[in-house]
């Protein structure tokens, strides 16, 4: 209790447990070797449990609680935190006091409350919580807000009915915090040596652990001997010769930063598609490139894009901030991909090769949290890698603008059309603010280019060059084998084959349906083959975890549907098994292309039976074109199919047989076999239609005119 001049305290000295207290003066005396201290009692008595608190805090006493009115303000609905729906005042506030870890009630220290009738909303709009270091920014008055500052080191602003952000922080009106300030700062401090020769940078070899972390995260192309591509048998055809192919990356000036990253990634020589595509793209020409899978198409378009962005320098300043109006990201390069996995992979490569530069890359795709992707866009974006659906969504929201696009890339373009994305592609290019084909550079890459893709190129590419490298769609580095296995014996045959497998690489097994994917994965795991799976019903985190487990050899067997057949660069895949053959030969091409990548040898085994007859003829043709060993039984089976006649041997309404009969009518130059009102005779007309389509397309590009309209 406080000690003062009253009836219990008349000014005399009191001795409490050896402590002498007086209200007059301070002195020190010694009696019987005992030291007593006399102190002035101008301050109230403080218990021992509070002394440590007073020494380490600016609080004056235990009784220094906020007034009742302030405590009422603490419970005001305007002081709610939207993140956890709790109150910021009272006991919900937890003080972080590094000098005192005692959690007793005596250690409670109240924040100081103040009412501000001219609130600006306070705080930073970029933070995720409700706290903001430093003073609030001043802005125009809006409503009433309550703020409190424990130890005067924090402040939080909220506004009544205002523009509070997700996470509980208020919005500032006068000078909003800009998330991409660092982005523009990086660009303002960067000078490209091609524009500023005095800024010439020497190649600096990174420390081993840092290079391992940055450039070997995706080790698909690390250590690969690209000399395996230097084969005179590899043909390179272009519709127009404008420059000689490259012999090394140093033949063109890509900039010091990019050339250094290429060395760090141990890219010693360009692959054939890179040799021809790089100079064409650097000449600012549109390109439609067809090259074998795993030949380095991703680097072929990323290198010129990163180099061009660095040469152009800092982007234009964003438009002025308007309250309530979202600020759109304005990328300079857009890469469209058919799947999330391929988009993520391209993004990783873009990050790797733009290391040490201000170039910023962002990836957006469906199945992931859209608010996180919007946050990334707000931090600045030069290269945007996207799937079509999520991009259309953000374009409609006004969070992305295509007005500054200088480079447009369609990767695995035929796959996007196969998946039904053509309307979205046309919408993105034509219905939003993307520059016209004469004002941007458009690049299309894929392993196959059927007629539908050629028409798309004719619509969106301007004065383009067609590039074809090697065997279209497949590679001679892959050994293809075909085995006759009936449906009932597939599991046991697969088990016997894997049991005798001596390879230390990865094995990728393709099936037709999602149910088969789960069933076969369970079957192999039960028999001690570590297996994971990937298909369309899995969430994006589940897909990423499965791919990471496969890449890291934790589960060296991956069962997948065709979602994994396109564009995925997974190193060390030595074996691909077509447990279920596809009905489209182009899908087969991309499936087996997951092995034999970048100069390595690979093996592809396919299980064939009566169910797969419709694709047999195309498969035989493809195997012959790549000089594969063909079993006699397979060749005889396909020959017998060709010799079969009449509607009794085929169902004219079957889509598979339509494709099959159409193929043979073209090869044999035959008419229809009659019957069914001339139903089969219609295939001869399809052949003529196909010729007319070729002739029509030959008007779009001289290459197809000179080659009879064929891209093979």
Swiss-Prot record:
Q: Tell me yes or no: is Protein biosynthesis among this UniProt entry's keywords.
A: yes
The short motif DEAD box is annotated over: 411-414
Q: Where is the composition biased (Polar residues)?
A: 11-24
Do you know which CDD domains this protein is assigned to? DEADc_DDX3_DDX4, SF2_C_DEAD
Q: Which reaction does it catalyse?
A: ATP + H2O = ADP + phosphate + H(+)
User: Disordered: where is this region?
Assistant: 1-183, 644-712
**Motif interval(s): Q motif:** 247-275
InterPro entries reported for this sequence: DEAD/DEAH_box_helicase_dom, Ded1/Dbp1_DEADc, Helicase_ATP-bd, Helicase_C-like, P-loop_NTPase, RNA-helicase_DEAD-box_CS, RNA_helicase_DEAD_Q_motif
For bias type Low complexity, the affected ranges are 25-42, 90-119, 140-157, 644-662
For bias type Basic and acidic residues, the affected ranges are 61-87, 687-699
> Can you list the GO cellular component terms from the UniProt entry?
cytoplasm; nucleus
Helicase ATP-binding domain ranges (all copies): 278-467
Q: What is its EC number?
A: 3.6.4.13
Where are stretches of biased composition, namely Gly residues?
120-132, 158-171, 671-682
SMART domains annotated for this entry? Answer: DEXDc, HELICc
Helicase C-terminal domain spans which residues? Answer: 477-638
> Among its keywords, does the record have Nucleotide-binding?
yes
Keywords from UniProt, A to Z, are: ATP-binding, Cytoplasm, Helicase, Hydrolase, Initiation factor, Nucleotide-binding, Protein biosynthesis, RNA-binding
Function noted in UniProt: Probable ATP-binding RNA helicase which may be involved in translation initiation.
* Notes concerning its domains: The Q motif is unique to and characteristic of the DEAD box family of RNA helicases and controls ATP binding and hydrolysis.
> What PANTHER family does the entry give?
ATP-DEPENDENT RNA HELICASE DBP3
Q: What is this protein called?
A: Probable ATP-dependent RNA helicase ddx3
Q: Which organism is it from?
A: Dictyostelium discoideum (Social amoeba)
């Amino acid at each position: 209790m406080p000690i003062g001049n009253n009836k219990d305290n008349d000014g005399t000295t009191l001795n409490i447990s050896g402590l002498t207290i007086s209200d007059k003066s301070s002195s020190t005396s010694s009696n019987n070797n005992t030291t007593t201290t006399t102190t002035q009692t101008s301050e109230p008595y403080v218990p021992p449990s509070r002394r440590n608190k007073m020494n380490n805090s600016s609080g004056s006493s235990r009784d220094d609680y906020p007034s009742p009115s302030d405590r009422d303000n603490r419970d005001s609905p305007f002081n709610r935190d939207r993140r956890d729906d709790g109150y910021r005042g009272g006991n919900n506030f937890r003080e972080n006091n590094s000098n005192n870890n005692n959690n007793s009630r005596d250690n409670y220290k109240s924040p100081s409350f103040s009412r501000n009738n001219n609130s600006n909303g306070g705080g930073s709009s970029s933070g995720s919580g409700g706290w903001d270091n430093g003073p609030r920014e001043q802005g125009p008055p809006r409503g009433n807000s309550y703020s409190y500052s424990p130890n005067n080191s924090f402040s939080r602003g909220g506004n009544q009915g205002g523009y509070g952000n997700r996470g509980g922080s208020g919005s500032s009106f006068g000078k909003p915090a800009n998330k991409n300030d660092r982005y523009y700062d990086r660009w303002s401090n960067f000078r490209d040596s091609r524009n500023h020769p005095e800024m010439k940078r020497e190649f600096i070899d990174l420390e081993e652990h840092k290079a391992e972390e940055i450039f070997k995260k995706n080790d698909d192309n690390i250590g690969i001997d690209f000399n395996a591509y230097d084969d005179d048998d590899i043909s390179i055809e272009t519709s127009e010769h404008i420059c000689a192919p490259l012999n090394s990356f140093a033949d063109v000036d890509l900039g010091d930063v990019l050339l250094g990253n290429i060395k760090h990634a141990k890219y010693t020589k360009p692959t054939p598609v890179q040799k021809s595509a790089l100079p064409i793209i650097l000449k600012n020409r549109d390109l439609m490139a067809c090259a074998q899978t795993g030949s380095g198409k991703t680097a072929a378009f990323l290198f010129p894009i990163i180099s061009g962005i660095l040469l152009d320098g800092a982007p234009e300043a964003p438009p002025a901030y308007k309250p309530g109006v979202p600020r759109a990201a304005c990328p300079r390069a857009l890469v469209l991909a058919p799947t999330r996995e391929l988009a993520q992979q391209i993004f990783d490569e873009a990050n790797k090769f733009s290391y040490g530069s201000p170039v910023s890359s962002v990836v957006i795709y469906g199945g992931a949290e859209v608010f996180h992707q919007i946050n990334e866009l707000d931090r600045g974006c030069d290269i945007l890698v996207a799937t079509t659906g999520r991009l259309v969504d953000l374009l409609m929201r006004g969070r992305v603008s295509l007005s500054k696009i200088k480079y447009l890339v369609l990767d695995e373009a035929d796959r996007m059309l196969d998946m039904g994305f053509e309307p979205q592609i046309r919408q993105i290019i034509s219905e939003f603010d993307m520059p016209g084909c004469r004002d941007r550079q458009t690049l299309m890459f894929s392993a196959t280019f059927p007629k539908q893709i050629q028409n798309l190129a004719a619509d969106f590419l301007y004065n383009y060059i067609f590039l074809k490298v090697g065997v279209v769609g497949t590679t001679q580095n892959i050994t293809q084998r075909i085995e006759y296995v009936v449906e009932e014996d597939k599991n046991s045959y697969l088990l016997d084959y894997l049991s005798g497998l001596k390879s230390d690489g990865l094995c990728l097994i393709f099936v037709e349906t999602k149910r088969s994917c789960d069933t076969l994965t369970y079957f192999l795991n039960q028999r001690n083959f570590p297996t994971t799976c990937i298909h369309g019903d899995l969430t994006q985190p589940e897909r990423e975890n499965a791919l990471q487990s496969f890449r890291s050899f934790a589960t060296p067997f991956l069962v997948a549907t065709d979602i994994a057949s396109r564009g995925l660069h997974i190193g060390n895949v030595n074996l691909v098994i077509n447990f279920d053959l596809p009905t489209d030969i182009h899908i087969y091409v991309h499936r087996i292309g997951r092995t034999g990548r970048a100069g390595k040898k690979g093996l592809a085994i396919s299980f064939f039976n009566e169910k797969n007859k419709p694709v047999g003829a195309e498969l035989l043709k493809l195997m012959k074109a790549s000089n594969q060993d063909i079993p006699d039984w397979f060749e005889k089976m396909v020959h017998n199919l060709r010799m079969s006649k009449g509607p009794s041997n085929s169902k004219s309404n079957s889509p598979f047989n339509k494709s099959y009969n159409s193929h043979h009518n073209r090869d044999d130059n035959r008419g229809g076999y009659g019957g069914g009102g001339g139903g089969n005779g219609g295939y001869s007309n399809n052949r003529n239609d196909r010729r007319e389509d070729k002739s029509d397309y030959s008007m779009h590009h001289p290459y197809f005119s000179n080659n009879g309209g064929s891209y093979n």
